[in-house]
């Protein structure tokens, strides 16, 4: 650990008995809206191209997920940080921007982040291999949190290679099972990178703090075609058909835990699990209730431990960030998976990790002026 980092008084891999007994107060997530990324990673306020999961008929199985050319590599994701989420907030500012007694426009959320941030925190108690880094900015009483890759992953590391293969299989599976409003999304000569990525925006109250976050989502194809019906979110994952008694606990603590955490955060009640053989052929896809997934793993991990660690870590981060009120200052929080420790350092003012853009700060300033001139706008924003 670098000497300029300070270690938090929190340990992911050890917890008190109460952390396994009392589940914290977390309200059911609310779906607030959605947006899409363009093929080049830019925000598009698009609510029409919803991706639906449709299981192919039995005659289509087995489905081959094998690569035809070069082996897959870890997907390099664009460094968009929170850009698209902030643009969504700006496009729906009447829902999220308000003016308090200090006559400054601010968000009606204590935390803005991606679902990945919350997933990493909840999985940390059982993560022993892969560390991560988060960037945190606090501005006008809201913390903005996103994942920041301080170090590049080792391309020849076996865990990274395994993750790259799993991501490739999942992208390939989606070309067979994901449809855009009833129309197949991907042609065989196109990759998933050439299409929109659909994200939902969610919120919940976490021990009295409102958390606003986005996540990539898939929808359940409705049984009827009634207009205006609420979307029902699902998930699509892959697991081996056959695993040994030693393989199952490892799978449950890693892959299955991540599936459950994502479903919990988004309020997903069921997911589709594709079962593949050793030759990367999917033989069937089963719909599984999320509560049944948890019951099958209850000896390997505790959802109460996961949720409580997320609460503790967010509280620690809040205490560190309490004196900060600057859109450019970023604090880096690093999780050491081998030790189960979290450390941090602050980078004051504009720096290489600054991710809250000037346009967002200017947008809040503009709303401050507009709302002070028009009291009705202030009232409407405060009650949303």
UniProtKB/Swiss-Prot annotation:
Q: Which InterPro entries match?
A: RAI1, RAI1-like_fam
Sorted UniProt keywords: Chromosome, Cytoplasm, Nucleus
Q: Which GO terms describe its cellular component?
A: chromosome; cytoplasm; cytosol; nucleus; perinuclear region of cytoplasm; Rhino-Deadlock-Cutoff Complex
The processes (GO biological process) annotated in the record are:
dorsal/ventral pattern formation; germarium-derived female germ-line cyst formation; NAD-cap decapping; nuclear-transcribed mRNA catabolic process; oocyte karyosome formation; oogenesis; ovarian fusome organization; P granule organization
Q: Which domain of life is it from?
A: Eukaryota
What biological function has been recorded for the protein in this entry? Involved in the piRNA pathway in germline tissues. Part of the Rhino-Deadlock-Cutoff (RDC) complex that stimulates piRNA biogenesis from chromatin regions corresponding to dual-strand, but not single-stranded, piRNA clusters. Promotes transcription of long piRNA precursors by preventing termination at canonical poly(A) sites. As part of the RDC complex, is recruited to chromatin enriched in histone modification H3K9me3 and might contribute to complex interaction by binding nascent transcript nucleic acid chains. Associates with chromatin upon exposure to homologous piRNA.
Q: What is this protein called?
A: Protein cutoff
Query: Per the UniProt entry, what species is this protein from, by scientific name?
Result: Drosophila melanogaster
Q: What is the lineage of its organism?
A: Eukaryota, Metazoa, Ecdysozoa, Arthropoda, Hexapoda
